[in-house]
Amino acid sequence: QEAGYNVIYKRPDNTEFAPDQNEMATLQGGYRFSEMTDQGTMSDYGLCDYYDNVYNLNQMDRGNYGYNEFQMKCFTSAEGFITSNGGGGVLCSYFEKPVLFYVPSGKELRPGYLTKQNSYIKKLSNSDINVVIDKGQTNDYSKLLNEMRKVFKWK
């Protein structure tokens, strides 16, 4: 836990939407999202239980709210967002809070696509957009962690 933040983790589980070509390849290939820890290999959802103050949105008590309404209430209360590029990142940008995009692939790699003043994302929102590019898809998250410290004022 850094700086007293709580983290709400949100990732669809391939059952909420019609799968795209990447999800189809993942499902057909039997691939799972996982990470090595001192406790062995665990899924990205399992990591939510592994770390303190990390909560899986899919497991939170929604009360009488539907999934989307609950998600919007959580997003409204957030201090900011860390997201991958794509539609989920666009949604995060609507709340006028700092957004940190991690971009390993896609059209967002183009210079200025997310950051220039007249970019698509800036036209949709008035959020402070920050971007970490991982063009070689090296999954070296040190740049992301450094940018998180700057954007969210961690020490």
Identify the role of each PLM range.
Residues 1-2:
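Histidine-anchored nucleotide/phosphate-binding helix
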Residues 5-109:
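Donor-binding and catalytic core of enzymes assembling or modifying cell-surface/extracellular glycoconjugates
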Residues 89-155:
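Nucleotide-sugar donor-binding patch of glycosyltransferase catalytic domains
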